[in-house]
C-alpha cells in the first residue's frame, strides 16, 4: 500500500496519478488518511477508475485502505466502510485522533493521565471493528510511536488483538516479531480448534448419533463453535 495525502490538501489527486501511473501494476492499495465521510472514498474510487483505464489496468484492481483519524471519521465509519467495493481495510490513526478530540495524553496510544476507570480507546477501537466486520473489511490498529518501548507496543497490540483486530502497524524492525506473534494463531488455540472440528464432525454423523450438539470435555459444542 502507498499512503497519499488526504483530500483536504491540494496534492491528493496528483499523488494518486503519479503512484498509479508509475507503479499501478504492482500496487495493491491506496491508503487514504483522515477520511471523514463516504464521499471522500467515492471520489478516490472514481479517480482510481480513471487512472486505471488510462494505464490499461483492470478497473477495480487497486483497493482502498481508509484511516480514521478524527471524530467525524469515527461517526461516519459505517458509511465509509460501505462506500466502495474497493475498501479493504479500516485503520485507526491514534495520534491525530487523540489530538482531534483533545485527549490529555502526550504519549500516543497510552491511557491519558487521570483516566483510571477503563480503557480510553475501547469505544474507538470497537466502533472501528464493528464497522469493519459488518462490511467484511480488515480492521487494523495504528502505530505505537515509542519505538524503543517494546513492552508498550506489546501491551497495546495485545489489546487490539484481544478485541479481534487483524493486525497493527509497525514503525520499527524491533516491533515486527511482536506483531507477528500477537496476531498469529497460537498453537494451543489451533490444536483446540482442530479438536472441536473433529468432535463436531463425529457427533453430527450417523455413526456418532447425528446430534446437533455435544460435549467436548466440559465444553458444549455445536454449529456455532
Each language-model region and where it sits:
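Expand to "…catalyze enediolate/carbanion chemistry for C-C bond making/breaking, isomerization
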Residues: 1-225
Amino acid at each position: 500500500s502507498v499512503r497519499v495525502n488526504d483530500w483536504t490538501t491540494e496534492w491528493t489527486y496528483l499523488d494518486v496519478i503519479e503512484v498509479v501511473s508509475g507503479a499501478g501494476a504492482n500496487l495493491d492499495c491506496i491508503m487514504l488518511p483522515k477520511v471523514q465521510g463516504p464521499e471522500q472514498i467515492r471520489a478516490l474510487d472514481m479517480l482510481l477508475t480513471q487512472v486505471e483505464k488510462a494505464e490499461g489496468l483492470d478497473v477495480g484492481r487497486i483497493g482502498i485502505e481508509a484511516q480514521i483519524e478524527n471524530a467525524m471519521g469515527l461517526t461516519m465509519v459505517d458509511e465509509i466502510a460501505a462506500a466502495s467495493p474497493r475498501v479493504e481495510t479500516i485503520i485507526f490513526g491514534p495520534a491525530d485522533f487523540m489530538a482531534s478530540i483533545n485527549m490529555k495524553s502526550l504519549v500516543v496510544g497510552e491511557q491519558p493521565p487521570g483516566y483510571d476507570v477503563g480503557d480510553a480507546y475501547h469505544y474507538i477501537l470497537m466502533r472501528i471493528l464493528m464497522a469493519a466486520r459488518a462490511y467484511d473489511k480488515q480492521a487494523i490498529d495504528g502505530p505505537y510511536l515509542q519505538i524503543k518501548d517494546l513492552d508498550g507496543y506489546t501491551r497495546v497490540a495485545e489489546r487490539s488483538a484481544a478485541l479481534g483486530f487483524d493486525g497493527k502497524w509497525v514503525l520499527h524492525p524491533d516491533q515486527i516479531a511482536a506483531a507477528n506473534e500477537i496476531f498469529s494463531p497460537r498453537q494451543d488455540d489451533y490444536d483446540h480448534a482442530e479438536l472441536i472440528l473433529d468432535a463436531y464432525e463425529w457427533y453430527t454423523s450417523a455413526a456418532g448419533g447425528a446430534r446437533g450438539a455435544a460435549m467436548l470435555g466440559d465444553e458444549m459444542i455445536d454449529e456455532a463453535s
